[in-house]
């Protein structure tokens, strides 16, 4: 797995799975650009890591000029772009009959349209360079339906099909596109959602959530980051259009 000096851009890289991916790629001596809407958290990450291979760009991925700027910043800072990891995402809990249109649009804009915009401008550079690799964070919710998050499920179903479409369209240009479908991962975002939408202590809720899969535990962000490392490396060179499910066996039931 030789990722030394490869340039990797990660959206939503300031926390959770994204931050685990940042650390994983830095450990492989890659150059990492983080595009995240949380400027304070991004700057705190830069201070904590204190690594010349790490660069932060404040980015709202629902804004096309901001996406263009993020891609340009990666190329300007490190001289190229080898891997785009579309990881940023949000979740709003509400059944269809109670969901506001504004919240529906917000979830779709971040989870799906933002991925389209980042990919669009990354592909323009990758086509010129004659190679590239895009990794999308999908979800088990893109394969089966989690209860009470229809907008999230719909957006992730779209991510799965967008991944396949790009893989088919750009394989002839030496650009691979794959996605990872995590199950329930122990992240700050999920912890917040657990407390807002369930009764009990955080520890009690986590124990209950862990019962849904055969491994009887929540996933770790690092475990998803390891899948991303594999997809970014030549170890997965014959893979494109694939969806790797990392869910503790949930969808095998």
From Swiss-Prot:
Sites where the protein binds substrate: 139
E.C. code: 1.1.1.385
Function, as annotated: Part of the bacABCDEFG operon responsible for the biosynthesis of bacilysin, an irreversible inactivator of the glutaminase domain of glucosamine synthetase. Catalyzes the dehydrogenation of the C7-hydroxyl group in the 4S-tetrahydrotyrosine (4S-H4Tyr) to yield anticapsin (epoxycyclohexanonyl-Ala).
Active site: 152
InterPro entries: NAD(P)-bd_dom_sf, Sc_DH/Rdtase_CS, SDR_fam
Name of the top EC class for this enzyme: oxidoreductase
Protein name: Dihydroanticapsin 7-dehydrogenase
Binding site for NAD(+): 9-31
Pfam short name (any one): adh_short_C2
Annotated metabolic or biological route of this protein: Antibiotic biosynthesis; bacilysin biosynthesis
BP term (GO), one: antibiotic biosynthetic process
Record keyword Hydrolase present: no
Gene Ontology MF term list: oxidoreductase activity
Domain of life: Bacteria
């Amino acid at each position: 797995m030789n990722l030394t000096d490869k340039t990797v851009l990660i959206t939503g890289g300031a926390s959770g799975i994204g931050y685990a991916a940042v650390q994983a790629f830095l450990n492989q001596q890659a150059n990492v650009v983080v595009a995240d809407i949380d400027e304070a958290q991004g700057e705190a990450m830069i201070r904590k890591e204190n690594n010349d291979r790490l660069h932060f760009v404040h980015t709202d991925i629902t804004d096309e000029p901001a996406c263009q700027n993020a891609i340009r910043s990666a190329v300007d800072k490190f001289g190229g772009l080898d891997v785009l990891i579309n990881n940023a995402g949000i979740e709003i809990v509400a059944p269809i009959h109670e969901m506001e249109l504004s919240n529906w649009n917000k979830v779709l804009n971040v989870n799906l349209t933002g991925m389209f915009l980042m990919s669009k401008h990354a592909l323009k550079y990758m086509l010129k360079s004659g190679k590239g690799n895009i990794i999308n964070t999908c979800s088990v919710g893109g394969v089966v339906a989690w209860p009470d998050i229809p907008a999230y499920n719909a957006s992730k179903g779209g991510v799965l099909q967008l991944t396949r479409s790009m893989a088919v369209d750009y394989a002839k240009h030496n650009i691979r596109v794959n996605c990872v479908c995590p199950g329930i991962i122990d992240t700050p975002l999920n912890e917040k959602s657990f407390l807002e939408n369930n009764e009990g202590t955080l520890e009690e809720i986590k124990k209950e959530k862990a019962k849904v899969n055969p491994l009887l535990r929540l996933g770790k962000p690092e475990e998803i980051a390891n899948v991303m490392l594999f997809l970014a490396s030549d170890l997965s060179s014959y893979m494109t259009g694939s969806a790797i499910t990392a869910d503790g066996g949930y969808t095998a039931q």
